[in-house]
Amino acid sequence: GVNFFDNAETYANGKSEIVMGNILKKMGWDRSSYVVSSKAFFGDGGKLPTQLGLNRKHLVEACDAALKRLQVEYLDLYYCHRPDKNTPIEETVLTMNHLIQQGKIFYWGTSEWSAQEIMEAHMVAKEYRMIGPTMEQPQYNMFHREKVEVEFNQIYKTVGLGTTIWSPLASGVLTDKYIGQMPEGTR
């Protein structure tokens, strides 16, 4: 069965995490029997610089909000949803390690980062004896293969990077619902 539940602060402006949290609570499953992830970057509706990105304030507050919405004590995986050119990578790596040390997250990763950005995070982590990102969540399907199959090939070996992909059916394009004409009302 399914035991991995992927979430993000931006999905329905946080409402999807509330729904997921209610389901997890209602089901009463042993917490060790499933994996829950969340992602931070885009925020959950706020537009101020401290409500977006990978700065320390936003990452810590977004993690706390995700834990509350999901009604869990920790996240198994916590992703930096996009790279942040406005925040030094050192600040992001330090903050993610702070969240690990606090027991709020077990592992941290990235989503839609380049191999170079991931390696930079690992170099910073190594320099300061911290934990670098352990997984990347790229788009991967028959239309988007280069990053997973070529760009990341070396870092799989170098740092043991794992992946959890998104959009394996290319947002529905690879299903039969798009054979012929596009159905009315689709994106």
Located regions from the model:
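N-terminal binding-site loop/beta-alpha segment at the start of enzyme catalytic domains
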Residues: 1-35, 73, 101
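Short, acidic/polar
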Residues: 1, 52-71, 89, 94, ...
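Short amphipathic alpha-helices and their capping/turn segments at secondary-structure boundaries
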Residues: 17-30, 63-68, 152-160
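Conserved beta-strand positions
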Residues: 7, 38, 77-80, 110, ...
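Alpha-helix N-cap and loop-to-helix initiation/capping positions
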Residues: 15, 19, 50-58, 84-91, ...
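A short acidic, helix-capping loop that chelates divalent metal ions and anchors anionic groups
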Residues: 43-50
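Beta/alpha (TIM)-barrel catalytic core signal, keyed to glycine-rich beta->alpha loops juxtaposed to Asp/Glu
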Residues: 85-187
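Short acidic capping loops at alpha-helix termini that bridge into adjacent secondary structure
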Residues: 30-34, 38, 73-77, 106-107, ...
